[in-house]
């Protein structure tokens, strides 16, 4: 497994065919696609990962939490149902296939899907350099052609700087935790949901203490942490703050779910920008600020039992305050946080100050970490002043054809929702998308070029003969989607 090999050099320096920045599900799907689509070409590939080991939503692997997506939308099945990297083959290899079938579900535990991802990642351990943070990607111009034909990838490992060169770079760094503006980026008592499982027990060590806990957010992660923390600390006062009027169920009905089909990406990309924005707004109920209905019903039942046992509300441990958002922050101590909460309803505004022992923030992620990493490459764009890096359908950054060789390029993963649709940050299209990226990098014809960036066909059309054309390479060590969708 993961046997990419044979080195290429330029002026005595090793040049990789591809370096992937980040080794989460997106890059892992690419690793699988390379192995299956290029069985003979064996390109020279390296994956760089900031974490010390493969991890996927480790902060939200809560007891009993399930996936929100069918296991069939794993890292390989939709591209190659016969792949050895399917979830079903993982079950077979681990002796649980029949037992899982007996469960009668398409939604495995998140814990099990994480184990599946780690199982896949272990096959490429020799192609990954863990504990390495990429800081910058710089273009390298060929003095003979005057065009950029490779890139220098700068990284740090334990304070030591590393540089490597690659013809192609895939940036799949996931999202960074997004906090409401009044809150500081770091405070020991403010925890983003992505760090929930590790930091909450560190901060709240007494399971029986009467802590004051706030949960900010209205989506799946907010609801899960609200329910879980109330269960972990039964004597705590836990309050959930929503900007809207209530927790709303996610829409995963069959017709709506078609927006997550791989073919929907083509349609969305070809849609005018104004219409794309409108479609994203219309379909927010599939992914943003929504909760699985069964969890909503559980929370409602918990609140109902409180009301049954104490109609006065004096002893209630769980509360939801709607139409309320954070408008101020005060650092009271290392163990206490002061929040100013503003309630707006029916044209009236009420401001309240609260003290909490812990604030859990589940307000999503920003998908902009690639901007700083790729800043030196902006000079290669037709317009270096644009806010976002423009990309083609095949996820390749639209650099000027006069500045960058057609045999070099940068690809973005998981930060293209405005051009490729709601599925871009999710698991839904990873298998097919990985095939498209691999085909664009290693199998593109001259007609693909920089002008349109479209891949001519999908993985099923790739032939072994096509694969033989490409350079062999010698690998060093073998991506986030953040959503569970």
UniProtKB/Swiss-Prot annotation:
Binding annotation for L-ornithine: 73, 257-260, 287, 428
Positions contributing to NADP(+) binding: 243, 287-289
Keyword NADP included in the entry's annotation: yes
Pathway: Siderophore biosynthesis
Pfam families (alphabetical): Lys_Orn_oxgnase
EC number: 1.14.13.196
Disruption phenotype: Impairs the production of desferriferrichrome and ferrichrome. Displays sharply decreased conidial formations and exhibits significantly retarded conidial germination. Shows tremendous increases in the nematode-induced trap formation.
Entry keywords, A to Z: FAD, Flavoprotein, Monooxygenase, NADP, Oxidoreductase
Cofactor(s) needed: FAD
Keyword Cytoplasm annotated: no
Catalytically driven reaction(s): L-ornithine + NADH + O2 = N(5)-hydroxy-L-ornithine + NAD(+) + H2O; L-ornithine + NADPH + O2 = N(5)-hydroxy-L-ornithine + NADP(+) + H2O
Binding residue positions for FAD: 49-57, 68, 134, 425-427
Superkingdom of origin: Eukaryota
Subunit and partners: Homotetramer.
Its biological purpose: L-ornithine N(5)-oxygenase; part of the gene cluster that mediates the biosynthesis of desferriferrichrome that chelates Fe(3+) to form ferrichrome. Fe(3+) is a key factor for induction of trap formation and the fungus uses the iron chelating desferriferrichrome to sequester Fe(3+) to inhibit trap formation and increase nematicidal activity.
Protein name: L-ornithine N(5)-oxygenase
Species in which this protein is naturally found: Arthrobotrys oligospora (strain ATCC 24927 / CBS 115.81 / DSM 1491) (Nematode-trapping fungus)
Gene name, Swiss-Prot/TrEMBL: Ao414
